[in-house]
Regions:
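Cytosolic catalytic regions of ATP/NTP-dependent phosphoryl-transfer enzymes
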Residues: 291-432, 439, 452-453, 461-473, ...
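Membrane-cytosol interface motif
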Residues: 92-109, 116, 278-297
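Membrane-embedded transport module
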Residues: 227, 266, 483-532, 547, ...
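Actuator/coupling domain of P-type ATPases
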Residues: 2-6, 10, 16-26, 74-75, ...
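Cytosolic catalytic regions of P-type ion-transporting ATPases
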Residues: 65, 96-210, 493-503, 507, ...
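Helix-interface capping motifs at the ends of transmembrane segments in multi-pass membrane proteins
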Residues: 46-68, 218-254, 271-277, 602-622, ...
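Transmembrane helix-loop-helix hairpins at the membrane interface
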Residues: 21-101, 107, 211, 215, ...
């Protein structure tokens, strides 16, 4: 290495003072101020404030009780998200990329965020380039597909530029950082994308909630204005009665707890995953996890342990100093993958003094590494079937038994030709086969149990590896993966159509290139599958990035950890069932809780529209709805969101929620409308009609909660029982403040009739909804079969 000097401590401090640090322009998590602002300064909190002012102006102090719920909702949201932020920030620091940096003449490890401009840094295979740099020494091959989309190895020699966001596929080099932080290439690309309006895609659930919130937000203002006009100037109610009724109607239409529950549930889920040593880089991936039906895994580091052991070489030629050749080949090197590390540990300690005049580092594209020792000869180590090519039959008798044992096998050969520049496939005719180098990984003890879990959950496993397909198939079968006997050599899949067909039919894929891994992910996604991809190597980066959910092992290549949405900090594949179960738990419970919230919103919206069209006043006061909301929606939804739920999520979020919420919302609307009709027909006082309506929707709400709690568990019994006591107890204890009035004989008869009708009405609407849902699904299935 030429004389290279790094920065001194004083120079580092000077650059920090000048702001020339590699700090990212924006933190991965929100700041404390952003969390407080986003929870306090919301559109609906502004609406609640305006409604409270309206109530204050007419001295309706008791009906301002909903502000207490708003306050506690906001406080809970802030506290939970701050807790999640602290946990995620700690894990982010633990998982941050560390690089070798030359400072004060000494090599030391420095976090990528702590680098400064002009730092001298060493990059190896699997490292992501942390900032723009220029190569000072060494040679490597970079992949810039993450920033340019072009998936090819680009040689980087002395003087070449390294772009931030790219990663090294092979080799090792020393470089000086030229542009850091916001000035780097990757940061400028991100800033331009944000300036053009591009944002990280939100999950289907959050997009659905955003649309619902926007619709309600737009509808509130005209409905509220017309309600005030109708009730005060047309029905000639007093201003206090008008404001009370209008505020109640608008509060009924606002899903005040739904968005909060969703945000808090996702934040808590990130925190729960963090406690399991799983770093979540993107909150949206939690929703994706709940929908995963296909899991793509690598063999090494996932099914097997990441560390490999090199066995004794099997000579193929007589009187050849195999150990001496291997000692020279691996002596003094810096291995950049598990295979090289195992061979270096076994053979590279002897220190045979052969000087290499040219070195080709291993690359997944051509699957060999080579060293030219001049007079001592040129030697290559790589995949036997790839190197031997048309001569592979000469190795079959010795190679096949090893592959059947699940071994990884490399070929050591002498190359009598000239090494290609740039690296490319070698001429098999120029090879002298010297030895087979068998290596082995132990299957992780937890692997069979983990794969049984996924099989039980209906998740298909696809094993995608760069190794020989027969060897991978043997390992997969021993790990208990169903369909492991269905394997294919990806080298034979010469078209996208052939690869797409194999993606559906086969379980094990061997000799897969990094680009083919990505194509396999795309093929599975094109068939409608939600794909999670696990990996730890530089050859997994492209597939991890394009999978619906990329899951990286922290012990693997830094580039893999940087592009994945989830990082297993313990690098333990056994953690995955818990990760998937957490995703399903939170999304299923949010979906179930959302159906409770929307019942109130649906019936209140329909009732408001009817109140505008007919000579009927809105029958509720804000405090009455607050009691019903607490007992049948808010409190039970919170507790239901905490329990386990491992069911695979199917269908669209909003469609699923509306299918559950519409029967309840329509039941409330029909019964309340009937109560108003009876009141209008029999001249029942408005306060008595309001009491009847409150008791009716409380009863319907408890029936809906009963349906949600099926099948009943001790927790479900506790939730339903306590909410029933809270609702009924609130009616008796808070009647004076709600206000609820004593019913006369006519009012009592109306209440009894409506309560008697509530259960059959709800059951009938649920039955009709399920029948309609089934008919639509049958029609879709028939239509799909016609197109097959």
């Amino acid at each position: 290495m030429p004389s290279i000097t790094g920065l001194t401590a004083a120079e580092v401090e000077a650059r920090r003072a000048a702001g020339q640090t590699n700090q990212p322009p924006k933190s991965q998590t929100k700041t404390t101020g952003e969390i407080v602002r986003d929870n306090v300064c919301t559109y609906f909190n502004l609406v609640f404030l305006v409604l409270a002012v309206m109530l204050a102006l007419v001295h309706s102090w008791l009906n301002m009780g909903f502000l207490g719920i708003v306050f506690w909702n906001t406080l809970i949201g802030i506290v939970q998200q701050l807790r999640a932020k602290r946990t995620i920030d700690k894990l982010t620091l633990v998982s941050a990329q560390k690089l070798r940096c030359l400072r004060d003449g000494q090599w030391c490890e420095v976090l990528s965020d702590d680098l400064v401009q002009d730092d001298v840094v060493e990059f190896g295979a699997g490292d992501q380039i942390a900032a723009d740099a220029v190569v000072l020494d060494g040679s490597a091959q970079a992949n810039e597909s993450l920033i340019t989309g072009e998936a090819r190895a680009i040689p980087k020699e002395c003087g070449a530029e390294l772009k931030s966001g790219s990663f090294l596929m092979a080799g090792r080099c020393v470089a000086r950082l030229t542009r850091v932080g916001a000035e780097s290439y990757a940061s400028r690309l991100t800033a331009e994308a944000q300036a053009d309006g591009h944002r990280v895609a939100r999950g289907e659930m959050m997009r659905s909630l955003d649309k619902l919130i926007k619709f309600i937000g737009v509808a509130l203002i005209p409905i509220g204005a017309v309600l005030i006009w109708k009730q005060h100037w047309v029905l000639e109610l007093s201003m206090k009665e008008t404001v009370d009724a209008t505020v109640a109607a608008l509060i009924g239409m606002i899903p005040e707890g739904l968005y909060l529950l969703t945000s808090v549930a996702l934040a808590v889920s990130m925190m729960r995953l963090a406690r399991r040593k799983v770093l979540t880089r993107d909150m949206n991936c939690i929703e994706t996890l709940a929908r995963v039906d296909t899991l793509c895994v690598d063999k090494t580091g996932t099914i097997t342990e990441s560390t490999m052991q090199a066995d004794d070489p099997l000579p193929l030629a007589e009187n050849t100093p195999i150990t001496e050749i291997l000692s020279a080949f691996y002596a003094g090197g810096q291995p950049d993958n598990d295979t090289a590390r195992a061979l270096t540990a076994r053979f590279g300690q002897g220190g045979t003094a052969w000087a290499a005049v040219r070195t080709i580092p291993f690359n997944t594209a051509y699957k060999y590494s080579a060293k030219d020792f001049g007079a001592q000869g040129c030697y290559v180590v790589g995949a036997p079937d790839v190197l031997a090519g048309s001569r592979a039959g000469e190795l079959a008798d010795r190679l096949t038994p090893l592959l059947a044992q699940g071994r990884r096998v490399l070929l050591l050969a002498k190359y009598n030709g000239t090494l290609p520049d740039p690296p490319a496939a070698l001429d098999p005719a120029q090879l002298e086969f010297l030895a087979l180098l068998p290596l082995q990984n132990r299957i992780r003890e937890s692997a069979p149990k983990t794969f049984r879990f996924f099989a039980k959950q209906g998740v298909k496993i696809k094993v995608i590896s760069g190794d020989d397909p027969q060897a991978v198939s043997h390992v997969a079968a021993n790990a208990g993966i169903a369909g492991a006997e269905h394997w294919v050599d990806a080298a034979t899949l010469q078209s996208e159509a052939a690869l797409a067909e194999a993606a559906e039919k086969c379980t094990v894929f061997g000799r897969v290139t990094p680009e083919q891994k990505r194509q396999l992910v795309h093929a599975l996604q094109a068939k409608g599958h939600t794909v999670a991809m696990t990996g730890d190597g530089v050859n997994d980066v492209l597939a991890l990035k394009d999978a619906d959910c990329g899951i990286a092992m922290a012990s693997g290549a830094q580039a893999a950890s940087q592009v994945a949405q989830l990082v297993l900090l313990d690098s333990d594949f056994a953690a995955l069932p818990g990760v998937v179960a957490e995703g399903r738990r939170v999304i299923n419970n949010i979906q179930r809780s959302a159906s409770l919230f929307l019942v109130k919103n649906i019936f209140s919206f329909l009732l408001s529209i009817v109140a505008l069209a007919l000579p009927l006043a809105y029958p509720f006061q804000p405090l009455q709805l607050s009691l019903v909301t607490f007992a049948t929606i808010g409190a039970p939804a919170f507790f239901l969101a905490l329990e386990p739920n491992h069911e695979l999520v199917h269908g669209k979020f909003m469609r699923n929620v509306l299918r559950k919420a519409l029967p309840g919302g329509l039941t409330d609307f029909l019964l309340v409308f009937c109560a108003q009709g009876f009141g209008y027909a029999f001249d029942i006082p408005s306060d008595m009609v309001g009491t009847i309506c409150t008791l009716v929707i409380l009863c319907v709400g408890l029936q809906i909660l009963w349906g949600v709690c099926i099948p009943f568990t001790p927790l479900h019994w506790a939730i339903w029982g306590s909410m029933t006591v809270a609702g009924v107890g609130g009616v008796f204890l808070l009647a004076r403040w709600l206000p609820l009035v004593r019913l006369d004989l006519g009012g009592t008869l109306v209440l009894v009739v409506l309560l008697a009708l509530s259960a059959p009405t709800l059951a009938g609407l649920v039955f009709m909804g399920e029948r309609l849902h089934g008919m639509v699904n049958d029609w879709k299935n028939k239509k799909a079969r016609k197109h097959v």
